[in-house]
Swiss-Prot record:
<keyword id="KW-0067">ATP-binding</keyword>
<comment type="function">
    <text>Acts as a ribosome collision sensor, splitting the ribosome into its 2 subunits. Detects stalled/collided 70S ribosomes which it binds and splits by an ATP-hydrolysis driven conformational change. Acts upstream of the ribosome quality control system (RQC), a ribosome-associated complex that mediates the extraction of incompletely synthesized nascent chains from stalled ribosomes and their subsequent degradation. Probably generates substrates for RQC.</text>
</comment>
<feature type="binding site">
    <location>
        <begin position="331"/>
        <end position="338"/>
    </location>
    <ligand>
        <name>ATP</name>
    </ligand>
</feature>
<dbReference type="InterPro" id="IPR036063">
    <property type="entry name" value="Smr_dom_sf"/>
</dbReference>
<dbReference type="GO" id="GO:0043023">
    <property type="term" value="F:ribosomal large subunit binding"/>
</dbReference>
<dbReference type="InterPro" id="IPR027417">
    <property type="entry name" value="P-loop_NTPase"/>
</dbReference>
<dbReference type="InterPro" id="IPR002625">
    <property type="entry name" value="Smr_dom"/>
</dbReference>
<keyword id="KW-0547">Nucleotide-binding</keyword>
<dbReference type="GO" id="GO:0006298">
    <property type="term" value="P:mismatch repair"/>
</dbReference>
<dbReference type="GO" id="GO:0045910">
    <property type="term" value="P:negative regulation of DNA recombination"/>
</dbReference>
<dbReference type="GO" id="GO:0016887">
    <property type="term" value="F:ATP hydrolysis activity"/>
</dbReference>
<dbReference type="GO" id="GO:0030983">
    <property type="term" value="F:mismatched DNA binding"/>
</dbReference>
<keyword id="KW-0255">Endonuclease</keyword>
<dbReference type="GO" id="GO:0140664">
    <property type="term" value="F:ATP-dependent DNA damage sensor activity"/>
</dbReference>
<keyword id="KW-0694">RNA-binding</keyword>
<comment type="function">
    <text>Endonuclease that is involved in the suppression of homologous recombination and thus may have a key role in the control of bacterial genetic diversity.</text>
</comment>
<dbReference type="InterPro" id="IPR045076">
    <property type="entry name" value="MutS"/>
</dbReference>
Length: 782
């Protein structure tokens, strides 16, 4: 895209707004050099990125970009052996933390469909070891900490001891020789502790003079008693500086070893901040994503000039590129024609830069190889040209470059010369541009061009509405209606005599009168059409409102139905839970039998399987499967009768009558109390001895040796873990693995606390490298 059009349309103002939305220096730098592209695929990719950022903002979420700085120069300097300062090292650590934070935040936005951003953060490499190495040596204020090395800790301990000894001796001087001192304080000169001694007591104190006051009355002396200690202190501070340099050298070498990863992280973070800034700008402008095309078709509803405040700007509908490829906006000067011209140009540049445009949803924007604009008189002064020559020089250059993939914007085409010649020249230029199949919008105040729009199929007239009552333009664009001067109406409103107005009208040609009357009629028809449209729009809104109300009622019905299903499911689950609770005591007995009486393992597992098979089968809607209940009379049921338990569709046998409405029946190995209405008599077999059975609390027959708790809430995870440990104990496994992930460590800590207090868990250890490392805890069962 040519630089001149970016300057003429003031595209820099847009990039400055974008720069203001970026949060890092890296993002601001990238925003500043934003340029329009001409590849449809690349533009669509940019629009996809912007749309993902806008989606995050719409859902009140955010990407945290705090603490991220431009560390590229520091990283490159470390790679050639340079020693970084403490602040530079701290910037590296903070940027590493910021990159890790950005990566985790975007990866955890599981409910959002943001594939581009999620793919981007896959290229961020967290370097915890380097981050921690720097943070363990340098505090948040950029100071090397004592714990940076054992040597530094020892040196600083020695320094503190020596400083204490020096202060103690000098404080003795201040107490015993206060009359010899200008002030009873201890100060420092040339990195040596000294006392402010009066000139006349120089010999009495004795020592080395390091400085004197401006008047010469006070000497800053180092008493002989502290010279040796000061020497030792100076030596220790030199050692301290050498050790600090060694530590910084070591940290710089570590930074250099991760050069490629760090530079890649910075590159990704820059792009993410740039994308996020585009999303925030879209929100600030109340913009929407344009559907891009390479057909030269533009359609914007309620489009707004991006540089005019939202509460002041007038929105307009603009569409061209199919039925007509050119728009000629006619009418008087100062009517807002140039604003419309720049609006189209700026929105085009924004869309091709991956920015959303300030218009309603559903807008469509074409992709142009070039946008050309002849607006204003920017060349005339600096090149000492007339207005006409300035415009024509630029137009000649444009005419040489335009193609069928160009957008051309002419402001006051043909102005600055004789009106008749200027109008003819304007029409000839438009014919040439249209013949090259370029898209063009031109503004003019020449009345001759009004007829031009009617005589060309590919051209449509337009005007900017003028309010005769207020004598001000409304800035509303009227497509299909050419502009008129309104001179007579304005003069009448301003008080010009009626006779003078009529005399003026009589002096203009018949053709001009006809054209003006036609335009007035068109304006009236256009206004009536708009009113009809608004009425139809109101009816449509009312219909949509009614439809929404019906949808709401339907949703309420669906919710009520779902609640009924849930109640049925809860009722069924309560029945299951009751049976399980009755089995709990027997489970305990069977555990004792297994430990003491040697219950066979296959019998134990078979019993558990049978109990699970007895669980009522629920459909996905939450209600029980339908059965055909056939209640039987009391006289039909006797101990030993073969029956069907209707609630679970299982065969069983009556053991005894508990009450008028309840029986004890055996289903498989399970004995349960069942209401009479839930039983169906099958037949009365021969009497047989019923072996005693035991019920147990069921679990799935196949119990996995691993339990994956990643992504679970803490409370839910512990409940699942408790049940799982019971299951693997019942299955007789010697060990099992609990997968909790590394994360923040909260879940891992909870798992370890549970394992530590469980009486049947003999021990636990972290997983080995092949087992998942610290993200897994392996438990030993007994």
């Amino acid at each position: 895209m040519n630089e001149r059009v970016l300057r003429v349309l003031d595209f820099k103002s847009v990039t400055e707004m974008l720069k203001g939305q970026a949060e890092t220096a890296l993002g601001k730098e990238r925003a500043k050099i934003t340029k329009p592209l001409s590849s449809l695929d690349k533009i669509n990719m940019l629009q996809d990125e912007t749309d993902e950022a806008a989606k995050i903002i719409r859902l009140n979420q955010a990407i945290p970009l705090g603490g991220i700085t431009d560390i590229r120069a520091s990283v490159k300097r470390s790679s050639i052996g340079g020693i970084l300062s403490t602040d530079e090292c701290l910037d590296v650590a903070n940027t590493l933390y910021g990159s890790r934070n950005v990566k985790n935040t975007i990866e955890n936005m599981e409910e959002l469909d943001i594939p581009i951003l999620k793919e981007l953060v896959e290229h961020i490499t967290p370097i915890r070891e380097l981050e921690q190495a720097i943070k363990s040596c340098i505090d948040d204020h950029g100071h090397i900490m004592d714990g940076a090395s054992s040597q530094l800790r020892s040196i600083r301990s020695s320094i503190r001891t020596l400083e204490s000894r020096i202060r103690e001796k000098l404080e003795n001087y201040t107490r015993s020789n206060s009359k010899m001192l200008s002030d009873a304080i201890i100060t420092i000169r040339n990195d040596r502790y000294v006392l402010p001694v009066k000139q006349e007591y120089r010999g009495a104190i004795g020592g080395i003079v390091h400085d004197q006051s401006a008047s010469g009355q006070t000497l800053f002396m180092e008493p002989k008693a502290v010279v040796d200690i000061n020497n030792s202190l100076h030596e220790s501070k030199s050692k301290e500086q050498l050790e600090i340099e060694r530590i910084l050298k070591d940290l710089s070498n570590q930074v250099a070893s991760y050069e490629q990863d760090l530079l890649e992280n910075v590159k990704v973070l820059t792009n993410i901040d740039f994308i996020y800034a585009r999303g925030k700008l879209a929100q600030a402008m109340k913009a929407s994503r344009p559907k891009m095309n390479d057909e030269g078709y533009m359609k914007m509803q309620q489009a707004r000039h991006p540089m005019i405040p939202i509460d002041e700007v007038v929105a307009n509908d603009i569409e061209f590129g199919r039925e007509y490829t050119s728009i000629v906006i006619t009418g008087p000067n100062t009517g807002g024609k140039t604003v419309t011209l720049k609006l189209v140009g700026l929105c085009t540049l924004m869309a091709q830069s991956g920015l959303q445009v300030p218009a309603l949803d559903g807008c469509e924007m074409p992709v142009f190889d070039e946008v050309f604009a002849d607006i204003g008189d920017e060349q005339s002064i600096e090149q000492n040209l007339s207005t006409f020559s300035s415009h024509m020089t630029n137009i000649v250059d444009i005419m040489k470059k335009i193609t069928d993939r160009s957008l051309v914007l002419f402001d006051e085409l043909g102005s600055g010369t004789d009106p008749q010649e200027g109008a003819a020249l304007a029409m000839a230029i438009l014919d040439e541009v249209i013949s090259k199949q370029a898209r063009v919008i031109a503004t003019t105040h020449y009345p001759e061009l009004k007829a031009y729009g009617y005589n060309r199929e590919q051209v449509v007239n337009a005007s900017v509405e003028f309010n005769v009552e207020t004598l001000k333009p409304t800035y509303r664009l009227l497509i299909g209606v050419p502009g008129r001067s309104n001179a007579f109406d304005i003069s009448t409103r301003l008080g010009l005599e009626r006779a003078t107005i009529e005399r003026a009208k009589s002096l203009i040609g018949v053709d001009s009168k006809s054209v003006e009357n036609m335009i007035a009629s068109l304006e009236k028809s256009h206004l009536e059409a708009e009113q009809d449209y608004e009425q139809a729009h109101d009816v449509l809104l009312e219909s949509e409102k009614l439809r929404n109300a019906l949808e709401h009622e339907w949703n309420l019905f669906e919710q009520k139905k779902e609640k009924l299903y849930k109640k049925a499911e809860e009722k069924a689950e309560k029945a299951i839970q009751k049976a399980r609770e009755e089995a709990e005591t027997i489970v305990s007995e069977m555990r004792q039998m297994k430990d003491s009486a040697g219950l066979k393992e296959h019998e134990w597992i078979e019993a558990r399987k049978m109990l699970d098979e007895a669980k009522p089968n629920l459909t996905k809607n939450g209600n029980q499967k339908q059965v055909d209940p056939k209640p039987v009379e009391d006289r039909q049921l006797q101990p030993g009768d073969e029956i069907k338990l209707l609630t679970v569709n299982q065969m069983g046998e009556v053991l005894e009558r508990v009450s008028d409405k309840e029986y004890l029946v055996q289903v498989g190995i399970m004995k349960v109390k069942v209401k009479r209405k839930d039983l169906e008599l099958i037949r009365k077999p021969k009497k047989k001895q019923v072996d005693p059975v035991t019920t147990i609390k069921g679990s799935n027959y196949h119990v996995s040796t691993e339990l994956d708790l990643r992504g679970e809430r803490y409370e839910d995870a512990i409940l699942r873990l408790e049940k799982y440990v019971d299951d693997v104990l019942l299955a007789g496994y010697p060990k099992a693995s609990i997968i909790h992930g590394k994360g923040t460590g909260a879940l891992r800590k909870g798992v370890q606390e549970f394992v530590g207090r469980h009486p049947r868990i003999k021990g636990a250890r972290p997983g080995e490298s092949g087992e998942g490392g610290s993200g897994v805890t392996v438990i030993q069962l007994g």
